[in-house]
Amino acid sequence: MSFLSNIFARRQQSSSVAKDRLQILLAHERGAGEAGESDLIRQLHKEIMEVIARHVAVDQDKVQIKVDRGSGCSMLEIDVEVPQELSGKRGS
């Protein structure tokens, strides 16, 4: 029965899935220290660029990703410079 429910189950929205993945990734890397942080930043940058590229053409050098670790929480900061004329791939 679980096979059929997997096929016909309602899929989560991509934003919800992305948020869950980031939370898991940040929680996992929280204790990794500085060496793990650079790997985390590279992986996040790659995945975020893939998602952005689906919707709009953005220069990879114009995307800045930073993780700030505080007491009890981490903050992921993403700065994306989007061109004024959106050359999106969705045709909107």
From Swiss-Prot:
One of its GO terms (biological process) is regulation of division septum assembly. Gene3D superfamilies: Cell division topological specificity factor MinE. It comes from the Bacteria. The keyword Transferase does not apply. It holds the Pfam family MinE. Keywords: Cell cycle, Cell division. HAMAP family: MinE (MF_00262). Belongs to the MinE family. Prevents the cell division inhibition by proteins MinC and MinD at internal division sites while permitting inhibition at polar sites. This ensures cell division at the proper site by restricting the formation of a division septum at the midpoint of the long axis of the cell. This is Cell division topological specificity factor. It comes from Gluconobacter oxydans (strain 621H) (Gluconobacter suboxydans). The lineage of its organism: Bacteria, Pseudomonadati, Pseudomonadota, Alphaproteobacteria, Acetobacterales.
